Amino acid sequence: QRQMCIRDSLSAVDARESRRIKARVEAERLPRGADPARHVKLGRGGLSDVEWLVQSMQLKHAGQIEDLRVTGTLPALRAIARHGLLPEAEVAVLEEAWLLATRIRAALLLWTGKVSDVLPTNMRDLEAVARLSGVGTTGGELEERYLRVTRLARQVFETRFYGL
């Protein structure tokens, strides 16, 4: 079992540096020409946003709340909810976005045979990903749900991460 390095809290300087690094990651890591609304890993409201927010909250509160000393995103989100660090509705949005992005990534791998982090625009590929992921019955339904959920997750991320 790995040991976690726990501080009493996240300093204002550390929080500011974390926000600066996240902004840099967003500016530099998204592949050139990629639509940030469709990139399930690095795009708006995707895996990266949820994980950055969760890990920042762990850094800020794990010194006082032992339940936050976990390595998984979903167990940490559930601990955040249990301890009232975020409203249940916001936790539900973040969890749905993370699960949806994870299912889409797995379905893309099954469909294409390679790792891909971009929600397809081609309707045939969208239909296949919808079926394989179990999310919706049509490509349009999958696309609409993903774009809606990640838009909401990004709103939570921006409010909470930049408000730390």
Please place each PLM-identified region on the residue numbering.
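A nucleotide- and high-energy phosphate-metabolite-utilizing enzyme signature
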Residues: 1-3, 7-164
